[in-house]
């Protein structure tokens, strides 16, 4: 066989994480995947991380205060925000940027007709890595637009972007949509919501667990604090745990259109009979409206085990890949295909610690504290619930937030105060507002 000169092989301009490169190890030539090569280079390189990433020290095991702070290259966080915001996305993936200060018009000044698509939040893939600081011993969540080892969150365009409903999901005919000026849909099972999302096309689904982790990352990056309600606003349910649902159910999406891609709140009055809400507001997380405190949201990409199933103990958390929901057989055992497993806390209570780990799992690990300490949110769980809900509703007041979770309900559960948020997992084509409206 003739020898081949590596220097004469075909040049390429890009590679995948799964591709391999040649390296010298102990005097011998070896192959290594690009992903493992990046991890090896970056392993333990704290100075590099401080240059290219911003970090949040996760101090849950050392303090009850919710103030964690932000370290590293905070200018990189400012830059990341510039690439994020609201777009109108058509069913086939054409996306036009809306004005960053007024979601009634596109960035080019063209008036928005929401019936031609869905109002979605789009942001670039975000790399993350959890690494224990060598000096303080505190785990730090490092985030960057650049590869830093660890993992990344990106569900659309081959993993290059995240595309999440800016508003809570509502119904237009048989389709789940993300539009302003309508009441969010409820009283449907997760399967019914997912099927309604699929009416838009096979690349449409519901917000998944990874995207909920991303929303948590955004909140921590902006405030360096786990108590999002105290920093941004308490949401529709306010700061006191009163039954405000009947009044909250009459509210409509799009209250934050005037806030565009910014962080902020709009104070509102919510009165349900003799119950008057305190500190009620509509909140906006750089274009994502009301991710907590109004209506629970179903999550795809995750389910829990049930002690009623012979193959499960009820402590399992299954996190699986793909824009799909589990089958009945999977719910009774484990997901098919690629998945990983974690262990859930099966007691309800205030969230003192999250699982964290290398995957930045945001399920509760330890219960304790109150609504102003540790993670400042409440979790509902047991050994039989398989559904995963996130964010809390207008019954729960200060118990709601970005760490507020529920895994205590059976799979076919439905309630008016439980809804969904649309997500898109396909390819995106970026166009101007004028061309999108003219099509």
Describe the predicted segments one by one:
Residues 45-122, 128-130, 439:
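GGW-centered surface loops in extracellular recognition modules
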Residues 305-322:
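A short, polar/charged loop-to-alpha-helix boundary motif
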Residues 23-43:
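Short, surface-exposed terminal/edge motifs of secreted or surface/virion proteins that either
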Residues 1-18, 436-439:
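Short, intrinsically disordered N-terminal pre-domain segments
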Residues 22-29, 57-62, 167-170:
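Short, flexible beta-strand-to-coil junctions
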Residues 54, 211-213, 234-258, 262, ...:
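C-terminal, surface-exposed recognition/capping segments
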